[in-house]
């Protein structure tokens, strides 16, 4: 999982690349309970340092790369909407600590798309499933191993794995 998802439930692995939320995660001791990856671990923490070539990537792409490095053959991208339908910041954690306001402009998604394409290219035997709904923007991925599926199809697939 990425960033503030630990507020909802404790994932097995967590990634945060933005320093403020990464520091908060370490200060709360989350890095001692689960595997936590960040760019700059606080000295004395159990956080793991993101290595190159993924060091400069955003949290979502780093999480994808970690899943691949750890041997996943199917990676499901949940919450990767890559855009906004109303020109506003669309994040489930908008208006909370470390996040923009829901009325702010959306974050540019081009970097995420580029980073995910590069990861998919580096791991051609992994199938990436972008789970979307009707409101998600279409994205033209350059790799054949990135597939768009709807939420209903995801539920069927995940229950078979």
Where do the language-model regions lie?
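Metal-ion/cofactor- or nucleotide/acyl-coenzyme-handling active-site neighborhoods
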Residues: 1-161
